[in-house]
A protein has these predicted regions:
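Helix-to-beta-strand junctions that scaffold the AdoMet/dcAdoMet cofactor pocket
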Residues: 90-91, 159-160, 176-177
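Conserved class I S-adenosyl-L-methionine
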Residues: 68-78
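A short glycine-rich, Lys/Arg-flanked "PGG" loop and its adjoining helix->strand segment in the class I
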Residues: 87, 165-178
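Class I SAM-dependent methyltransferase Rossmann-like catalytic core
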Residues: 35-63, 67
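Conserved beta-strand signature within the Rossmann-like core of class I S-adenosyl-L-methionine
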Residues: 97, 179-187
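C-terminal lobe and adjacent flexible extensions of AdoMet/dcAdoMet transferase-like proteins
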Residues: 257-275
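S-adenosyl-L-methionine
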Residues: 110-138
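A short acidic, Gly/Pro-enriched loop at the edge of an enzyme's catalytic core
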Residues: 140-150
Length: 275
């Protein structure tokens, strides 16, 4: 069994290699100094920092139009990769809502417990984070018309599996101000196969996502290939969870999956119409 430090080192090396093609696309995005400082903070967890070369957090948030005075909603924060950046960045002048996953799933409950322990106990660093819930029957993620930016990272497949993706996107639409932005990152499904409405393998077709968002009332205003990974064939034994960072197969074929890297992901920017 690889120890934790070695695994992080191997994962970091793999992600750096994976990021070569996407880095050029991300490098063209100019990031403000405060956001760069939040990403570079020594207080972030080493395991999260190790993923930065492939996730391009500062560039992605800049692409979505993040600003320090905004009201921002993060959906289903998981372990807090993005919260650890957004919280300090927004603490002084912004407002930050986090819509947690509903209780009842053991894995999600564990993540939520760890998230609460880390982020609600340090108001000086993370500011006042307003907690709400998204799904399966709770969709008031923030006061209607209050948010400048709503963000979801690799969550849409979960809402599809739960049967409430349309309601989740409608909640995002309601929470945003006219002209507000909805940013979506998700594992990109293959276009040569029909979309599983439950997204059981964790992949969602980009065109399917765009159609869902338009059905909710959004207009597509941008897309980015900064998280593209052409090595991801999307036919893995355990779906997207076969690949890093989950590596669901344990030691079996680990080197192969590390060589592939994290999944191929799309980044889409939607806007709530101004009128």
């Amino acid at each position: 069994m690889l120890n934790r430090r070695l695994l992080i080192s191997l994962l970091a090396a793999t992600l750096i290699a994976q990021s070569d093609g996407a880095t050029a696309r991300a490098a063209a995005i100019q990031v403000d100094t405060a956001l760069s400082a939040a990403v570079a903070s020594p207080e972030r967890l080493p395991a999260a920092v190790a993923r930065d070369p492939v996730r391009h957090p500062a560039q992605e948030l800049t692409f979505f139009g993040l600003a320090p005075t905004q009201t921002v909603v993060e959906l289903w924060p998981g372990g807090g990769y993005w919260t650890d950046i957004l919280g300090p960045y927004l603490a002084a002048r912004g407002h930050f809502y986090v819509a947690l996953a509903p209780a009842g799933d053991a894995d999600e409950d564990s993540l939520t417990a760890k998230w609460r322990t880390r982020f609600t106990a340090q108001p000086d660093r993370y500011g006042t984070i307003v907690l709400t819930t998204l799904g399966p029957d709770k969709f008031e993620i923030a006061p209607p018309g209050s948010a400048d930016l709503v963000l979801t990272f690799r969550n849409l497949h979960n809402w599809m599996d739960g049967g409430y993706a349309p309601q989740a996107l409608a909640a995002c639409f309601r929470a945003l101000k006219p002209g507000g932005i909805f940013g979506v990152e998700e594992h990109r499904g293959r276009t040569d196969r029909p979309q599983d409405p439950k997204a059981k393998n964790g992949y969602v077709r980009q065109d399917y996502t765009i159609a869902l968002a338009k059905q909710a009332g959004f207009e597509l205003v941008g897309s980015s290939e900064m998280l593209a990974n052409p090595r991801d064939t999307k036919d893995w034994v355990d779906g997207v969870w076969t690949l890093p960072p989950t590596l669901s197969q344990g030691e079996k074929d680990r080197d192969r999956y590390l060589a592939v890297g994290e999944a191929d992901n799309f980044v889409l920017k939607f806007r709530k119409p101004r009128h």
